[in-house]
Amino acid sequence: MLLFTSCIKQINLYTGDDEQHEGGNNDDDKEKPQEQTYLYPFGNEVQGDITAGIFIKVKDAPQVPLEAGMPCLKYNKPLLLLLVQDDCKQSAYCRTWAAINGKPVSNSDPYPTPTVQEPDKTAQLYYNSAHLRKGDLPPNVLPAVRTLGSTDGTGKEVRFAFTTTLSAEEEWMDQDVDVNPGYEKDYYRFFMKRGLNWDEIKEMMNYGVGIAFHDVMAENVNDVEEIKQHYGIAQSKIQEQLAGRKCKMLARPNGNDTYIDAALQYEDIRTMATESNGEDLYPFRAIESLDKVALNRSFEEVQENIKDEIRQQRRAPERNRKAVHIGVHNTDNDWIKLLEWINDNYGKDGDDSVWFPSQEEYYEYNYYRTHGNVKVEQTDEHTIKLTVHLPIGECFYYPSVTVNLSGLKKEDIVSVESDDAVSGLSYNNFEEGIMLNIDCRKHLAEHATHFVEQYEKDRSNASNKADALYFVGMLKDSERKTALLNRIQ
């Protein structure tokens, strides 16, 4: 199931009425977001194909032939759900991302913001990442409760992810943030901005959120060559801001197929989403790479209709089960309730049947599955070797797969070890064999260390502790992992 969220451009109400806003106009109160936020070094991720070795020590030699392969969906999940939020909306951060990752959530109920001219004025209040860091939050913010996700089939949490579109050519993505803890005379600093800034993009990407092109600043949006040119301009800005990271997805804006035509000719864009003229995604039929394929999505504002679609696809025979592909312009309290409902029914607090990644992560996994290979061999009576080959394409950042190995059970295993190409590893029984989750991200240990360090700065922050445990939990067993866990306790 794919969900997409889209945004409408707004008047910039950020600064409000300067005469009434005494706190926060001083430049000393502002943070330049791009100077503050850590980002996983995507630009220095593994280059070139990956060949990973897994070594399984067993009690006795297997009595049946061993077979290995990658399932259609990661973690052997039977249901695919994808969420894409268009137009670079601020709510992607302070609502969608926040709700998934156990952070305070921006309340969409209007809050009193009276002025002399408008004593009954109300407004929805939002926050930025700089506000969250400093504890400067709207007065009606919804408190952090829990994280939302599923498991990897071995008991480890895998939080939901989604895609946000970027407006990379817009200057407002570089906007400063007015941070003023304790100031309550007015709340202009929490009024909705034009969109996300790069600070929020970086923080969300650290948690698995994907990015996509959307509108570009072409004068003629019906000119393929001009749109291609602006893809390049936007891509350069993205690389500059995101440590060399590129964007490989397009969410078609405004029903304009010229963007699709331009994307087909623009090398970096590999996966697309559209409301029409695309292909429905049937994950259990996908035998090709889906490269340069525009996947159909739909916009649905009635949450009950989305629930009905999820129920219908969950009941459908596997081969006929579609990914539910939904677009939405803005997320509010009702959308947060929908995410919680998905978690409670199909996630880790339900039947644990859903895989909820970003579209680009799904695209990569399907590419690895259809173009990579797994070789299994018994090197001696007590050792089985798995060799996993992953072909790395341009702009690939999620080298992580599930491998099923039949003919062997967890109870038969003495130990599982891997070579240095593997940074994360977990396994468990699955059907008539075992499943192994193999992560080959180059900087996964450094990434986990960052979140441990964030927790060490404030050990009273329960959400930061949950983050530290979550990211350290991704690592394969090692002395380094043990040392990081000891720092959290």
Where do the protein language model's features map onto the residues?
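Bacterial Sec-dependent N-terminal signal peptides
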Residues: 4-46
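Active-site beta->alpha N-cap acidic-glycine motif
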Residues: 46-203, 207, 237, 246-247, ...
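C-terminal domain-boundary segment and adjacent tail
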Residues: 57-58, 64-65, 107-118, 269-284, ...
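Solvent-exposed loop/turn segments at secondary-structure junctions
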Residues: 87-91, 168-173, 211, 215-221, ...
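CE4/NodB-like, metal-dependent polysaccharide N-deacetylase domain
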Residues: 145-151, 161, 209-210, 215-219, ...
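Catalytic domains of cell-wall/extracellular-matrix polysaccharide-remodeling enzymes
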Residues: 217-299, 334
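C-terminal beta-strand-rich structural cap/linker in extracellular carbohydrate-active enzymes
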Residues: 394, 425-447
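Beta-rich interaction/scaffold domains
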Residues: 443-489
